[in-house]
């Protein structure tokens, strides 16, 4: 009995250490690559959602989507948690500078959207993800994202 508990405890420790090897995210946040994400199924306008994200964690903003793989990851998170078929992402032109920008300052390299009004939502459909620009005053669920603190590997 004692050995069984010790072995099970050891396996639990290994499982938790492997889970955190990608990014060191707080409880309730999910990791992908070097970022942490959290989907919120409450409806806010774009400005309120961005402010809410910034209050959650230092460096947190509405999610920037920098690749199709990241877009798929965020969409899969949202499918599990959001009842609405769309959600805010961090792309906008709210400062009317004739250039679209991510709220976290990331470069706009990857895009999957149709240009229109000032803020961008991700439309969630099984097997298909696209972006649409809509009025920033619309209220939608949203995803926050921040750069995770990585654990430095122990020296050998």
Curated annotation (Swiss-Prot):
Alphabetical keyword list: Disulfide bond, Hemostasis impairing toxin, Lectin, Secreted, Signal, Toxin
Q: Does the keyword Disulfide bond apply?
A: yes
Instruction: Give the matching Pfam families.
Output: Lectin_C
Gene3D superfamilies xref list: Mannose-Binding Protein A, subunit A (3.10.100.10)
**Paired cysteines (S-S):** 25-36, 53-144, 119-136
**Reported tissue expression:** Expressed by the venom gland.
Q: Signal peptide location in the record? A: 1-23
Q: Which GO MF terms are attached to this record?
A: carbohydrate binding; toxin activity
What residue stretches are annotated with the C-type lectin domain?
32-145
Q: Which SMART domains match?
A: CLECT
GO cellular component labels: extracellular region
Q: What is its main location?
A: secreted
Q: Kindly give the InterPro entries that the UniProt entry links to this protein.
A: C-type_lectin-like, C-type_lectin-like/link_sf, C-type_lectin/snaclec_domain, C-type_lectin_CS, CTDL_fold
Query: Where in the cell does this protein reside?
Result: Secreted
**Protein family per UniProt:** Belongs to the snaclec family.
Function description? Interferes with one step of hemostasis (modulation of platelet aggregation, or coagulation cascade, for example).
Report further notes: Calcium is required for ligand binding.
How would you summarize the oligomeric state and partners of this protein? Heterodimer of subunits A and B; disulfide-linked.
Protein's name according to its UniProt entry: Snaclec subunit B
Please name the source species.
Answer: Philodryas olfersii (Green snake)
């Amino acid at each position: 009995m004692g050995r069984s508990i010790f072995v099970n405890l050891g396996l639990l420790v290994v499982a938790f250490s492997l889970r955190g090897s990608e990014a060191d995210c707080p409880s309730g946040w999910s990791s992908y690559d070097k970022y942490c994400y959290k989907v919120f199924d409450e409806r806010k306008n774009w400005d309120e959602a961005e402010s809410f994200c910034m209050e959650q964690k230092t460096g947190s903003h509405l999610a920037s989507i920098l690749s199709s793989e990241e877009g798929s990851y965020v969409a899969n998170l949202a499918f599990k948690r959001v009842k609405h078929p769309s959600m805010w992402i961090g792309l906008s032109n709210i400062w009317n500078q004739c250039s679209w920008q991510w709220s976290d300052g990331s470069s706009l390299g990857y895009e999957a959207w149709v240009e229109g009004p000032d803020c961008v939502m991700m439309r969630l459909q099984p097997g298909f993800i696209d972006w649409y620009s809509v009025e920033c005053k619309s209220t939608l669920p949203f995803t926050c994202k921040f750069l995770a603190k990585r654990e430095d590997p122990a020296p050998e």
